[in-house]
Amino acid sequence: MAKDMDSVVQLAKHRGFVFPGSEIYGGLSNTWDYGPLGVELKNNIKQAWWKKFISQSPYNVGLDAAILMNPRTWEASGHLGNFNDPMIDNKDSKIRYRADKLIEDYMQNEKGDENFIADGLSFDEMKRIIDEEGIKDPVSGTSNWTDIRQFNLMFKTFQGVTEDSTNEIFLRPETAQGIFVNYKNVQRSMRKKLPFGIGQIGKSFRNEITPGNFIFRTREFEQMELEFFCKPGEEIEWQNYWKTFAEKWLLDLGIKNDSIRLRDHDEDELSHYSNATTDIEYKFPFGWGELWGIASRTDYDLKQHSEFSGDDFKYHDPETNEKYIPYCIEPSLGADRVTLAFLCDAYDREGVEGSKDERTVLHFHPAIAPYKAAVLPLSKKLSEEAIKVYEQLSENFTVDFDESQSIGKRYRRQDEIGTPYCITFDFDSLEDQQVTVRDRDSMEQVRMPISELNDFISEKVRF
């Protein structure tokens, strides 16, 4: 069925995946809190990323760098001087927009050009398109726009007791720079030889002009980033490797093949530090959106930090005896965006065979489902024995225990939150020590010994 964003958001709020931030005080624009099921889903996704990109990789190691860094870091990286978005205001509604996203939304949704990208356009080119197309503010309905101007995305705060320029620091806008400044520490302490990578998961902050689309674009967000260092000249080979690796990770976790596409950046769209970038985009209900950027950052970052810090970042190649600054490939994935993608991809409303009823179901891969199973006693009289099954399984998996309402309603509730297996403990279970296991997707039921449940679920959640 065609999915709409409102249905996904409504389910996410209703079933405890995501709540509006600070809701009892009227909320705070574009802030979201992950509820009990949302935090399990997101943690499972992060663990799946860490498992494949760090733990099981012969190349990569992990890091957890501080959010607050010496401000010189952001001078060296270019964020203080160049980290800007094109801003435009509608004079009638007084609402501010990112000019490039305003144009993209119009061209993709109104003109039907799904592949239109505004990145790389100059301010004059963007203003010309807005004027020539007569793009209107969706709130006021007018085309009464200001000129386009720059807007710095860094969140500024102060360290210490006085709020002056000497104590000015910033919330990091990306996790990558924490990796670059620790490059030598990691390389030396772990005795790593090229090629190798450093990955981390952490919060970043960007004062976005027009955040929106639920958790797709927020000012506080979490990144899963890998900086992979290689010999200059080998960067395109490794970029292709990580493109394939990242795409396979998504498909293996259940994302549908026709829901994603790979899009190479045009030359005029590339960031100043990149000689090649490919985005893995997902087809959200609101249109195609960037999910994963795989960029060849060349030696830009290490060169900049070498120049600003005075440290030598050259690598001594033991095979060729050469010294050079490594090139870097960066696969950067937004944890919140990919969580939204998994929610959208899993969401379905479908008819029930042999019935006029419909059910809402989240078809999560078992590896990322918030609960791997739910134990359901057929009657509350059986709860004392059924809880023993729950306790046995919860030693290895996240498991729900639900004894309220009819068994049919409990099945539907578990379908809505994406639980792959419902385990019904009935009166026969007292005698034969077997339970009925219901599959979420097929709704088929099989009888199984309680002693085999651990092995059964372990096999199903393997990734």
UniProtKB/Swiss-Prot annotation:
Disulfide bonds: none
Summary of the function given for this chain in its UniProt record: Catalyzes the attachment of glycine to tRNA(Gly).
Keyword Transmembrane listed: no
Species classification: Bacteria, Bacillati, Bacillota, Bacilli, Bacillales
Family: Belongs to the class-II aminoacyl-tRNA synthetase family.
Keywords, alphabetical: Aminoacyl-tRNA synthetase, ATP-binding, Cytoplasm, Ligase, Nucleotide-binding, Protein biosynthesis
Example GO BP: glycyl-tRNA aminoacylation
PROSITE patterns the UniProt entry points to: AA_TRNA_LIGASE_II (PS50862)
Protein's name in the database: Glycine--tRNA ligase
Pfam family, one: HGTP_anticodon
EC number: 6.1.1.14
Gene: glyQS
